[in-house]
């Protein structure tokens, strides 16, 4: 009998490969970030509902979340590069925060406000997220990435789905 389950494989891929991660196609002129985060909200609520059902079906079931992971290292020790790495990590970790802690982190809400993104959510949605958090966190680790406060200055390298700045300390 299987007792360990994942609701969405690499749920954060919706931000990096929207069609592959959630089947999203954008209309011309559409606010793509708005659409991605609204779809992410629906996936997070669906995950909470699936977690609820899994626990009702068999109290021994353990349900987890799953992330395509890999830390973002700052390109230099310059504060803007350190901050850029943190911001890139937060874009991915926010999915874990919602699924494991049961609410949207303040840093995500503040970033949405800065970008003019308004995610429609009901009180019922928020209660489902709060009441049905995951039992464990899992991830696929593909590669580390490098972030800079000024990526235009830096040499980019491609790896899997994520593009990143070239890490000058690693051989390719």
Walk through the language-model features, giving the residues of each:
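Active-site region of glycoside hydrolase catalytic domains
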Residues: 1-172
């Amino acid at each position: 009998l299987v007792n360990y389950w994942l609701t969405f494989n690499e749920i954060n891929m919706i931000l990096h490969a929207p069609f592959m991660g959630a089947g999203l196609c954008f209309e011309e002129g559409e606010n793509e970030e708005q659409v991605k985060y609204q779809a992410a909200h629906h996936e997070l609520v669906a995950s909470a509902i699936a977690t609820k059902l899994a626990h009702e079906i068999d109290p021994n079931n353990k349900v987890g979340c799953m992330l395509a992971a890999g830390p973002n290292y700052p390109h230099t020790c310059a504060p803007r590069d350190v901050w850029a790495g943190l911001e890139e990590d937060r874009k991915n970790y926010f999915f874990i925060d919602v699924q494991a802690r049961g609410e949207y982190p303040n840093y995500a809400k503040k970033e949405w406000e800065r970008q003019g993104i308004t995610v429609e959510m009901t009180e019922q949605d928020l209660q489902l997220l709060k009441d049905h958090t995951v039992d464990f966190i899992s991830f696929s680790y593909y590669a580390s990435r490098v972030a800079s406060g000024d990526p235009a200055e830096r040499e980019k390298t491609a790896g899997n789905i994520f593009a990143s700045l070239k890490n000058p300390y690693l051989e390719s």
